[in-house]
Swiss-Prot record:
NCBIfam families: rplS_bact. GO terms for biological process: translation. It holds the Pfam family Ribosomal_L19. This is Large ribosomal subunit protein bL19. The lineage of its organism: Bacteria, Pseudomonadati, Campylobacterota, Epsilonproteobacteria, Campylobacterales. GO terms for molecular function: structural constituent of ribosome. The gene is rplS.
Amino acid sequence: MRNKYIEAFENAQIAGKNIPDFRAGDTLRVATRIHEGDKTRIQNFEGICIARRGSGTGETFIIRKIGANSVGVERIFPIFSDSIEEIKVLRKGRVRRAKLFYLRELRGKAAKIRELRK
């Protein structure tokens, strides 16, 4: 049984955020707030969502992009993090899995995900 105070706090955290509906295979742009000394700036990270896990305030998602020199870069973001300014869905992907970890081994066009038709 969960503590009612913790549950009330988590519900307040969830209600305050506007999270778009996305799943594995979607291309996302995540804008994060970065603090460097006394300055603050926004950094965008754009890539394919390869997994979502957890529930409630502990829910996370993994974004993978191909960086410079064809090096794969992955970042794990907590969905309800205060440092996330915005999550924007750029494309809806058509996949048949909830976890796309197999994309780590694929290169080039083989790693492309088809776009979901409407």
